[in-house]
Amino acid sequence: MWIHFPVRNYIHLSHTILHYPCPDNAGHVCGHRNVSRNGLKDGLGVGVVSGGVDRTVYDRDTYPHPIKESDEDLGGGGVGSRERVGPVGGDHCHG
């Protein structure tokens, strides 16, 4: 199964490497990161899940920083904390 993006990058469900665009240099591949076989994420806030439940939410205002919800948030009771997970690009970007 192939999923095509306007920036000419791709995700293939059999790959464990995810290619994503540089936020400052659209159309160029910024780098890659290892992802698990249980779920793949792209830098555009679209989730591709091959098993289990997708629990990652992307904050589009601060792209490409994903925000992960804690398990308490998913239980439906009370307000849980949100953990910001690192920049995906940063120093590794190249043109």
UniProtKB/Swiss-Prot annotation:
UniProt-annotated stretches for the region Disordered: 57-95
Compositionally biased region (Basic and acidic residues): 57-69, 81-95
Protein name: Putative uncharacterized protein 068R
